[in-house]
């Protein structure tokens, strides 16, 4: 692995693993600005990745915005795919023109597939079929935020904050580095009316009970690549070390291929140095997925958190709003965080502006900024069934068999249902059709639900499924 990854990449892997392990150590409490006290900003945004879209939009609407990140703001370490129609909010927000959004799309596939070891291959159209130029998107968001007057603070991490009746005081510390040659800038303190947490898995507030360690990169010189096909989910082996490893891969321009290896687990079950360990497996097993003497052009990695919604939410705080992966606003089954963020940022940002105008920034009011689609919890129940450690079966083929039955059913139901499932948007009627079709292929599915989920999780899952049904009936 050392020959494959640069010193800078290894340093950032260490920082990510340390930040994830220490996420709960943030110093949080009361004693912030009193009512009527001057504050520096309307919004302080923690995290300068894709959540930068909030900074650009809110600053353009006249709000005083500051952003900080432990790395350089706008420096991403993921590649993204999305369907073309889901990019529309970038245009509707007036952050980008149609021509600029078109320029962000590097490649468009004919279709995508999901393929399971020992099972079948199931194609779907208009799902994750556009390759987005992540660097160009983030550079554009940073430039737009700066042009609108946002204050950007690179290489600083959240040390803690204090909430008061008049605002929140946010304390920043220089980001830790393994390179002694790098000069650390001084600690900083900011005050704002609201703190927006877009820190993903490193967030001290992150609402997740599942986590998905993910490693990979942009590679060249691979064989077995069809530039017309995106590989959404693929397995090449059964459960090993109590984990079902899954690949995804997307052809890019100029013969490049972006691929990830990941698995689903509960945070307490993570091994030591999980990203390093997974990279070792990535390099060792990648030829089973794609042959060729590949060259790693750009490493991509991280922790993707997910919240099943079948366990109680962590307690919310006044004047703190979670966005993106930190809020778990995507299906824990498909982990389409990029699409979820782009779909949701505009209504969430407008709702936040309204709360600021009304000075309603208590936890209850901020919780209503985003209304959770009932279908997310339904997906959460299925995700828990994919965590091998929760299953009674010791058959290493079991998870692949479950996935094959599920996706064979989606393929049978057609692109609309299949696509809605992957995009977190499946409705009640289609979900029931999906479960019935899956049960025909795998009659044990209902027994598995009751064996994997606890009584309280089953109760919450049933309640959320009822909410999905109510949404259908109330809409006619």
Regions found by a protein language model. Name each.
Residues 148-287, 345:
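Predominantly flavin-linked oxidoreductase catalytic cores and closely associated redox partners
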Residues 1-42:
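Extreme N-terminal leader/targeting segments of oxidoreductases
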Residues 75-113:
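N-terminal FAD cofactor-binding segment of flavoenzymes
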Residues 122-143, 214-217, 268-274:
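Short beta-strand to alpha-helix junction loop
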């Amino acid at each position: 692995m050392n020959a494959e990854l640069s010193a800078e990449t290894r340093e950032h892997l260490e920082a990510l693993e340390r930040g994830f392990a220490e996420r709960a150590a943030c110093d949080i409490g009361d004693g912030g600005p009193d009512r009527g006290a001057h504050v520096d900003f309307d919004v302080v945004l923690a995290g300068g990745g894709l959540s930068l879209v909030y900074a650009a939009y809110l600053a353009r609407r006249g709000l005083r915005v500051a952003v900080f990140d432990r790395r350089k703001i706008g420096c991403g370490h993921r590649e993204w795919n999305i369907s073309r129609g889901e990019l529309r909010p970038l245009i509707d927000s007036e952050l980008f023109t149609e021509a600029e959004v078109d320029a962000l799309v590097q490649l468009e596939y004919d279709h995508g597939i999901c393929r399971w070891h020992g099972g079948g291959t199931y194609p779907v159209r208009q799902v994750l079929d556009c390759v987005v130029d992540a660097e160009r998107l983030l550079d554009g968001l940073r430039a737009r935020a700066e042009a609108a007057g946002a204050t950007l603070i690179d290489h600083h991490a959240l040390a803690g904050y204090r909430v008061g009746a008049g605002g929140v005081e946010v304390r920043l510390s220089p980001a830790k580095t393994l390179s002694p040659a790098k000069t650390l800038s001084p600690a900083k303190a900011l005050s704002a009316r609201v703190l927006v947490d877009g820190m993903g898995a490193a967030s001290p507030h992150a609402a997740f009970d599942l986590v998905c360690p993910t490693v990979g990169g942009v590679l060249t010189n691979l064989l077995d690549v069809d530039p017309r096909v995106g590989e959404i989910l693929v397995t090449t082996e059964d459960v090993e070390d109590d984990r079902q490893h899954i690949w995804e891969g997307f052809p890019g321009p100029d013969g490049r291929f972006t691929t990830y290896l990941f698995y689903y687990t509960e945070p307490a079950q993570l091994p030591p140095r999980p990203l390093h360990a997974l990279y070792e497996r990535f390099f060792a097993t990648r030829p089973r997925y794609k042959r060729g003497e590949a060259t790693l052009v750009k490493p991509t990695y991280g922790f993707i958190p997910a919240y099943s919604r079948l366990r109680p939410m962590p307690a919310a705080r006044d004047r703190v709003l979670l966005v993106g992966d930190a809020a778990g606003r995507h299906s824990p089954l498909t982990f389409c965080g990029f699409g979820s963020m782009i779909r949701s940022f505009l209504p969430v940002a407008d709702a936040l502006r309204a709360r600021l105008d009304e000075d309603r920034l208590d936890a209850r009011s901020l919780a209503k900024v985003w209304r959770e689609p009932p279908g997310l919890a339904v997906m959460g129940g299925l995700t828990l069934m994919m965590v091998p450690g929760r299953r009674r079966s010791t058959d290493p083929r079991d998870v692949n068999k479950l996935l094959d039955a599920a996706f064979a059913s989606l393929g049978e139901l057609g692109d609309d249902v299949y696509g809605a499932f992957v995009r977190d948007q499946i409705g009640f009627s289609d979900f029931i059709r999906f479960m019935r079709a899956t049960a025909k292929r795998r009659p044990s599915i209902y027994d598995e639900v009751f064996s994997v989920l606890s009584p309280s999780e089953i109760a919450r899952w049933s309640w959320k499924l009822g909410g999905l049904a109510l949404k259908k009936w109330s809409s006619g």
